Amino acid sequence: MKKRAIVAVIVLLLIGLDQLVKSYIVQQIPLGEVRPWIPNFVSLTYLQNRGAAFSILQDQQLLFAVITLVVVIGAIWYLHKHMEDSFWMVLGLTLIIAGGLGNFIDRVSQGFVVDMFHLDFINFAIFNVADSYLTVGVIILLIAMLKEEINGN
């Protein structure tokens, strides 16, 4: 039970950080403006993403909300079943849950997701903190599952 409580607190803290950064961006940067943050590496901007990655499927908020809920519920179920597995499995699932819920909050409360990080050195989608959680979480989860498969678990 203690491990579940710790994971729940971590999820809440991660969501809080995501929402705090988004709130700061909305208050400090006008929509569409780009400001250098780490020169030649990352700029900050304020984008209202009404779609998915690379702004695909614009204005399909209900679809994204349903998909997000299904993924988050699935991740919570899988986490519950695998809570005693490797640290990395738990970490990956924790990040996926936090990232999914962070963007879900935006979609339900505002009708769009606030994105802010623009990589200056590559033509890549503008993304947010929750997207980072999701990406890192999926990578960690895949590596953990691959490692378990190799080890025969």
Roles of regions detected by a PLM:
Residues 1-153:
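Alpha-helical transmembrane bundles and membrane-interface segments of multipass inner-membrane proteins
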